[in-house]
Amino acid sequence: MENGVMIQYFEWNLPNDGKHWQRLKEDAKHLSEIGVTGVWIPPAYKGTSQFDVGYGAYDLWDLGEFDQKGTIRTKYGTKQELIEAIEELHKYDIDVYLDAVLNHKGGADETETFLAIEVDPENRNVEISAPFDIDGWTKFTFPGRNNKYSAFKWNFTLFDGVDYDNRTGKNGIYKIVGDNKNWDQGVDSELGNYDYLMNADIDFSHPEVREEIIRWGKWVVNELKIDGFRMDAVKHINDEFMAEFLTRIRETYGEDFYSVGEYWRNDLGKLKEYLNNVGYETDLFDVGLHFNMFEASKNRRDYDLRRIFDNTIVAASPLEAVTFVDNHDSQRGSALESQIEDWFVPHAYALILLAKDGYPCLFYGNYYGIGGEKSPHQWIIDKLLEVRKNNAYGDQINYFNNPNVVAVHRTGKDEWTGCVAVLSNADYDSEIQLEVGRERTGQIWQEVAGSGFEDVVINEEGKGDFRVKAEKIAVWVRKN
């Protein structure tokens, strides 16, 4: 879809009031009006408790329907409320992407005793003990669900490792011992082998496990009528399984079923290798672009803005790039904290929303606010969304000649007249002369991002002098 926009419709610190699905339903019309075409919803199944953001996934088959872990609803609401929210979004032609947490399971119902080997947390290929008995939280029986939808039960033979020995009360990384059992291959090589992330780590070499997860995938797509998945923590999951999972889903639901993977590593080579390994079955979040923007926001005028797209997916493999500014993991106080500083947030959104390439993803925290505090950025994001919808079409020409002042020109096409965005990290006001085309001679262009600049008249050479204030952005469009 041309000029589509995704929104991550949650942040880490949402209230545990069970009303999030209701809020989403009520917001559907507004999301459509601002140009949102896809909504990434949080993990919608039962976690370790009602407070779980969703990444401590306990029972994928419980979408807020069964009394488990002390609650029927999830943090976000009930299954019925979720279904109603999705139906409302679909009325406005907005796709829904469910966050799929397939790497691990949390909140086991019972412990089991089994042989394990402790490994070095800094290199999981190095064993630091002989095999010994531990008591691990690996037995999942889902008593509250009572076999509805799936009778599958989980035990230690279906996992690769845990991080806690209940017998000794000791934390560590324990690799489960069994026939042909080892860490999954086809994962990131960080820490030797980055199969293990948290909780009870699922063994994707086990055929029964693969079939159960694929069965769940097909079921949840049909049950909720979702249009895609956001695949969590893919660098910890066997890449062959990831390709198989998405292929099998599409065999049932069609090639248009969407997927974007979270591979959190600022290494373009690794991300390109991953795309190749999974046969380009999924898009990826552009982590490299996020970190470039993070560095730019920290280093202010010392950052060379001409390098903002260096080592990014959107530059190297644009059809697979989901561009984003921040998310629940990068927001302040989170595990992978790297939040873009406030002054640069408008720059960052201008770079992703006015660009030709990439599928841009808004962050709930940037748009609505974090922890109940209203975001100061909503007005500028709204303005950029308006320009994306009404002006940002055609080819993209980057004017990256000055380390502190850069410009992006969308040339326009058909009835859409294009736009110019000028971005500055300089500590002084600037002006940049750009050629927008001789056919635009005499046109009047206005600045719409709140600078208060006088209009620009395009001269007989098709050029205009576009201004920008210190450390600000200016967005110019043809005046009607």
Predicted regions and their residues:
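Active-site-proximal helices and loops of the catalytic beta/alpha 8
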Residues: 2-5, 23-33, 43-45, 49-64, ...
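Soluble non-cytosolic domains of exported or imported proteins
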Residues: 15-22, 76, 80, 207, ...
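Active-site-adjacent "subsite" loops/lids of carbohydrate-active enzymes
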Residues: 178-218, 223, 234
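Boundary/entry segment of secreted carbohydrate-active catalytic domains
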Residues: 1-18, 196-205
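Substrate-binding cleft of carbohydrate-active enzyme catalytic domains
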Residues: 74-108
